[in-house]
Amino acid sequence: MKKEIIIIALVFALGGSAAAIFLKSGWDKKVAPPQEETGFWENEEKTKLTIENVEFEVEIAQTLTERTKGLADRTDLCSQCGMLFIFEADNYHAFWMKGTFIPLDIIWLDKNWQVVDFTAFAQPQAGRPDEELPIYRPKTPARYVLELPGGTVEKIRGFKVGSQVELER
């Protein structure tokens, strides 16, 4: 009996330590963009950007909670609207359409705001089990991801891998 109590106490102590480390790690902190932009996104909820002379107003998703939620549960998105996902580092940031009700174009950007890859017209997957949902990944590591209404990239004259995205400052 004493042995069981000691084991249970040890499990709780280790679990509490792990939880404290996790909570202190800042898992939901605002993400810092590249050094030259430090502070640019702080307290920002939206920004304007331009791709091939077409302007968009996009919401900024910079915390883990915001990035996880993304555009899920939205039933519409204006033609000049979208969401910009800010990440700390370049990576093969993967996206899926869980809980998303509208088609989206997913655009991956490098740290210099250049398009490195995109998926046009990712379709909603209502009713499909999570394990059957397609996962969309870039072919090249990216720092930022931009989601726009499905079909937008086809309408932007000159849009391609290599297109430059310009931010309003």
Question: Language-model segments: which ranges?
Answer:
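Compact, glycine-rich, soluble single-domain proteins
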Residues: 2-7, 19-169
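Catalytic phosphate/metal-binding cores of nucleic-acid and nucleotide-processing enzymes, i.e., regions
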Residues: 9, 14
